[in-house]
């Protein structure tokens, strides 16, 4: 392994360790996402406890912190295997952040960002798969699970040299969704539409209180 490849892997892990969910919630004076909602410091939980603007900020940052290290490694001609390890390192940083006592999220947005530099065609397919699954089922977690399962096949079709690292990344995502898989199996997983309904109901209650 070259010094460049090793440096990019370390850089990716440190980038991933910057938990945007926690930082955004602190800046916006929202509750700690690790202690509220689902307990997961990710965009979906921030949507639940803080609203769309905060969630969008978290989502964009989480994607970028996976995309930037991999894109830089690609520009520095890091070999495909170590490019894949750079992507995995970014996700491991998100899941086990050194700056936040190793309590992180599930790595879906960061993994998406890390895979994006492979190609826009692949990025479009991954986005379409997630959106279609969520629209049909209403489950954000199921969208992530299906996308993780299919991602290695998409990569094998477009850029086969990255299949093994992406497969490892998919396994990592699936492991982090173990509890979600169990709740889906039992029919206990909450649908993403429920978050919007709750926000709407809360807003209506606040309006009623103002009128009183």
Curated annotation (Swiss-Prot):
It catalyses: an acyl phosphate + sn-glycerol 3-phosphate = a 1-acyl-sn-glycero-3-phosphate + phosphate. Its EC number is 2.3.1.275. One of its GO terms (cellular component) is plasma membrane. The chain crosses the membrane at residues 5-25, 53-73, 80-100, 112-132, 138-158. InterPro entries: G3P_acylTferase_PlsY. Belongs to the PlsY family. This is Glycerol-3-phosphate acyltransferase. It comes from Serratia proteamaculans (strain 568). The lineage of its organism: Bacteria, Pseudomonadati, Pseudomonadota, Gammaproteobacteria, Enterobacterales. The gene is plsY.
